[in-house]
Amino acid sequence: MRKGRFLGCVMGMSFLLFTNAAWGVDLVGHRGARGLAPENTLPSFARALSLGVTVLELDTAITKDSVIVVSHDPILNPNITRDKYGKWLEKPGPAIHSLTFTELQQYDVGRLKPNTKYANSFPEQKALDGTRIPRLVDLFSLVKKSGNEQVRFFIELKVSPHKPEETLDPETYAKRVIDLIHKEGMAARASILSFDWRTLQVVQKIAPEISTIYLSIQQRAFDNIATEKPEGSLWTAGFQHKDHGSVPRMVKAAGGKIWSPYFGDLTEAQLKEAHDLGLQVGVWTVNEPGDSKKMLDVGVDGITTDRPDVLRQIMAERGMKLPVATPVQP
């Protein structure tokens, strides 16, 4: 979700995922281009490809009949979801793992629910009624259709140690996604990211050719590091802040090569420490121009944004080389 030096690391290829020599800083389209089109949908990814990004960031879930789909929420989000009658969901749910893919396709995710805080956050998102939650394989097909052989994928596995009932266990979940990545020939272009570091430990063990990205956030609403808790965090696979002294050192101890913190948590001292440890650092989710400029100034390796068009303009004004645009229709 963050900065970008994500080049892929298969069969001796460099782990420089965020430091792509072609353009230096990865421009990562968050859920495609969430600020412009319905999130995690084919129109959103098509918009990002048409603008030109180095990486497509996306989230995954798995249906009752084992179809890997692209969705941020393990349970359907009432802020973006209407049923087959066009009625907005009144509360979260049902869980995607309780639905077959055919059942899931009855839901429309092409519009933000009006007059909600969520909708107000993305005033320029274009509604596209009738848009459905896609399969991961559909996204791979769209990219192949675009002819873009350089764009990479940051694939988040949505697992929570506090809500194991909402998803498959980390081992099964990771293996199914990895199997599809290999089947589609995308291992060299895919990175798996998660806030639940247990999942990343599984990936490093069973598919070391696929790079991992360690997500972190230390905010009141969500904190997967839990520095203030004597018992530590359930999210970090046993690698605790009290034992290592900093998040970069936790990532390093976990065998990670890429750290992706929430941009508001990152300090210049942490960035320097991470780089000194040999880690790449990509930040998420940066939408305000001033914040994007600051992140570029301090030297992050990649920036994840809902507005790739805005970040591209900032990069262009600085004379930075831009990723190729490959216009495509979903």
Task: Please give the residue ranges for each predicted region.
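Phosphate-group recognition and catalysis centered on beta-loop-alpha active-site segments
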Residues: 20-330
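Positively charged n-region of N-terminal signal peptides that target proteins for export
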Residues: 1-5
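Bacterial N-terminal signal peptides
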Residues: 8-19
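General helical structural elements
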Residues: 6-9, 34-35
